[in-house]
Amino acid sequence: MAITAQMVKELREKTGAGMMDCKKALEENGGSLEKAVDWLRQKGLSKAAKKAGRATSEGVIGNYIHSTGKIAVLVEVKCETDFVARNEKFQEFAKNVAMQIAANNPAAVDAESVDPAIIEREREVYRQKAREEGKPENIIEKIVEGGIKKFYKEICLLEQPYIRDDKMTIRDLLNDVIATLGENVTIGRFVRMQLGAEEA
């Protein structure tokens, strides 16, 4: 497959990697944008991968209040410098993350912050269901892992499809912001309140 300038541009915008690295990634992966993104991440060439370890001590508290006034969200979005914290794109990202939380009500930012006991309970539910359906033991673990991946997409903010573009996840959106702004950005704590909802 011929690699076009448009494909290289799209990959570069998505990852922030250099033009030649993007071209090589596309060539190595038969023109597949998705595989090229993974290839760049594995090689550590995407800006998000390079910036992941840098401290984020500045930022904003993004907020969203639904037009009905019955749902509100506060989310901590952190970056490295106050210059970026004041950037319009950064603030728009914080607002979009707050809207995502309002719409999808995630339980955690990422898989690492989910209580392991909850994950183990979910695994057991998937195991039992597979056994009841008479699935062979050798494929039950694959079924369980598939179920857990789906579970993460429901409860983990970074794994959820973005409400404004379901072809990308919040993690993809975060990586785009990192590439665009040129510094590490992280999503910290969040709180979602809904009028009349029971506290968990």
Swiss-Prot record:
One GO CC annotation: cytoplasm
SUPFAM superfamilies found in the cross-reference section: Elongation factor Ts (EF-Ts), dimerisation domain, UBA-like
Segments for region (Involved in Mg(2+) ion dislocation from EF-Tu): 81-84
Function: Associates with the EF-Tu.GDP complex and induces the exchange of GDP to GTP. It remains bound to the aminoacyl-tRNA.EF-Tu.GTP complex up to the GTP hydrolysis stage on the ribosome.
Subcellular location: Cytoplasm
Family: Belongs to the EF-Ts family.
Superkingdom as given in the UniProt entry: Bacteria
MF terms in GO: translation elongation factor activity
Protein name according to UniProt: Elongation factor Ts
PANTHER family: ELONGATION FACTOR TS, ELONGATION FACTOR TS, MITOCHONDRIAL
Recorded name of the encoding gene: tsf
Keywords: Cytoplasm, Elongation factor, Protein biosynthesis
InterPro entries the record matches: EF-Ts_dimer_sf (IPR036402), Transl_elong_EFTs/EF1B (IPR001816), Transl_elong_EFTs/EF1B_dimer (IPR014039), Transl_elong_Ts_CS (IPR018101), UBA-like_sf (IPR009060)
Name of one Pfam family that matches: EF_TS
